[in-house]
Amino acid sequence: MAASGYEGTELGPWSYLPADPTTLRRELDARRLSLVGAFCPVTLHDRDRSAASVRTARETIDLLAAAGAPVLVLADAGDERRAAIAGRVPADGSAGFSHGEWRRFSDGVNTIARYARERGLLTAFHPHVASYVERTEEIARLMRDTDPTLVGLCLDTGHVAYGGGDPVEIARTHARRVRHVHLKDLRREVRADALARQLDFPGAVSLGVFAPLGDGSLDLRGTLSALRAVGYAGWLIVEQDVRLGVSPIAAPLRDAKRSRAYLTEVLAA
């Protein structure tokens, strides 16, 4: 990341980077990288699993607070059922949470976000492909059911688009809730192929559905313009989902530099 010219990073999967805050800060400082936050998937709708998810979230929050990071990026962990129909989730809600599950999930998100605020962190909820908050309607439901003073939105352009949504419209509709941004580009022709073949989400990633910024089909300029219009001043996290050893994307350093060059050009315009 440092070699690519980036200024910050999220934590990544637990143990990907050091879990000791002193060691973590030392290693990041040596590379002149800021710790921005951490992606934390949770299962909160299931009574039998929610307590463990809350504990994991609290551990993540404690590490972020000790390391000086500003944002917890919370997401539903999803399951194989939703992964199998990623991008093809029925609009009628038949493959989604029940009313009771929505209530438990939203209450759990509020609980975690409240603890994050106590530790000095913002919480941004990340709609994610293959999770139960993927479709535009599901994003709206979660925003409606959670406390706006506690829970914001992490706008991930690639995941919103793969789920059938419009990142520009999401940025405008939920402007006051956007607290964090993941910038991805997506190849719509690859998405269409994956959906036509009824591939699960990992299968689509293996096809190379996500591209370096500027090489895909998304209106990233429009998204950034919409964010500017509402005064967004947070981090822009550049991402490109791949599967190691499977994806045709073979040069992560090259792609990371390419994405940064594109973003620098757009922001300077």
Kindly give the residue locations of the regions a language model identified.
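Active-site acidic/histidine proton-transfer and metal-coordination neighborhood
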Residues: 49-153
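A short, acidic, amphipathic alpha-helical segment used as a generic capping/interface helix at domain edges
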Residues: 215-229
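Non-cysteine beta-strand/loop elements that form the S-adenosyl-L-methionine
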Residues: 36-38, 71-77, 175-189, 237-238
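Acidic/histidine-rich catalytic cores of soluble enzymes
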Residues: 8-9, 106-217
